[in-house]
Amino acid sequence: MRKIVLSAWITLDGCIAGPDDKMEWLRGDAQMMAYEQSFVDAADTLLFGRKTFNDFSNYWPPLANGAEPGANPLPMPVEQQRQYARTIDPMKKIVVSASGKVEPWRNVCVLSTIDPIQIDDLKREPGKNIAMYGSLSVLRALAEHGQIDEYELLVHPTFAGKGKPLFNAPFDTLELKSAHPFRSGVMLMKYSATKGTADEKHAM
């Protein structure tokens, strides 16, 4: 069975966005872009929530086709971004959207909700990892069903103070696989998940 692997950029206090969804704390460099490239190289399917998918579909396809980065470009080398864009452009993309209204992109499959059986069937298909980005509601639903196998957290050296936390329920079932510092001060923390939520684990 293949894995669902989550990649998330977070603050030291566990937020993926500050107040009003502000993201000024993000840091980026060639090392971090190389990580993002290796993350998608290990996958053949991408999994998104609607908002994150729409952000990706507006930013990356033009780069894959040779355009320059548009408004609010990521602080990473353009040629590395272009390589990443060309890698993800043809990949299968699964989007969870209750409305079904998503931006156009290649090879997109829309799910109206998280169905644990459907997700397990997807994981049983032959292939490489399923790389997951964004959407707190999708992330939390999958985590509650124990369907995220690995977490790759890019921990930034800053505190949001308040904002959107990665989790809003206790999960203590992660095991550290590796920790790697970047020159930017960001720490890449890779964890594997054991099965079950914290409550289920404590009930054993």
Label each PLM-derived region with a short phrase.
Residues 1-204:
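Enzymes that bind and transform nitrogen-containing heteroaromatic metabolites
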